[in-house]
């Protein structure tokens, strides 16, 4: 299993930090009006409708269209990262500014915040997953890839270094 050390200086934000607020975290949760737990495989960042959404990593656009599973207008960027294939996913966009096959650099404009798909208001749903052919995708907490945001709830967050495990 590889352990990656990410320095705070390497973080980028898909939405400017002074604009976005994390409203839902990675992990198990109970949705309003429901009784069963569901896994939330990303983070939700509330932001004004139309705010720019930017890539956090360089890579190739492998999906830029409407997602039929609830993500609305969505962009996937596939990158090589620490010997793994990593996908960063940006969902519920109001507009997509890239096309499938394009190569993007970190901080490239991908689209704008929206409320498309299964959404309760303008926000960005941001996911990270490791592609594992024949084994299924492995979702990772995307907070290790972004700079700090304001939060609805105080949770521990490491400012100077973050460790994540990628692999089995």
Regions found by a protein language model. Give the residues of each.
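Positively charged n-region of N-terminal signal peptides that target proteins for export
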Residues: 1-3
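Generic beta-structure capping elements
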Residues: 25-27, 80, 93, 145
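Short peripheral tails and domain-boundary helices/loops at the edges of structured domains
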Residues: 129-155
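Surface-exposed, glycine-biased beta-strand/turn segments
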Residues: 6-73, 106, 115, 119, ...
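Short glycine/proline-centered loop/turn elements that form peptide/ligand docking sites
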Residues: 97-98, 109, 115-122
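Short acidic/polar mixed-charge low-complexity motifs
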Residues: 51, 84-86, 134-138
